[in-house]
């Protein structure tokens, strides 16, 4: 699978109604771990059902779902079930889905062993982006890194990407793949080889949908 031509991209775009929507996360989710973990799943889906109905009512027709590697790492089977539930609810409410496979927002920091965030009850921190406090002075001194920059984690990250893309490569409910959200916004030029590796991983699964990376 190669990069689409400009004509093919415009033909695809013009074949769709005006795409309008939002990044979707239920209002009862303290953060993205809360969105994707199995803990509290039934309650999360009830709220998502109501709020995706609101999306439909106000004229949205597409939403972005941003994956969470730390949850997938700890609950890979359950994670795929939760993803399917979200996509099914979106389809029920006439919302196509853009799946975001990686983003540089709130990368882990440091040079020691990576420890994924604990699952279970998540605490709200009102007034901050995605319910998380700003970095402390000590945290700011630590170097941010992408999971793909750690060899032991990179293999697992690629496995997650391939697993998700393979399952939905020919699914009409998926509008497109946001392979990398805002590459370089945190780690600058270090994002370039990661971008290449992720595009290779996605394209190896031969998705029929377009693949994007927004600046």
Regions found by a protein language model. Give the residues of each.
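Active-site mouth of glycoside hydrolases
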Residues: 1-215
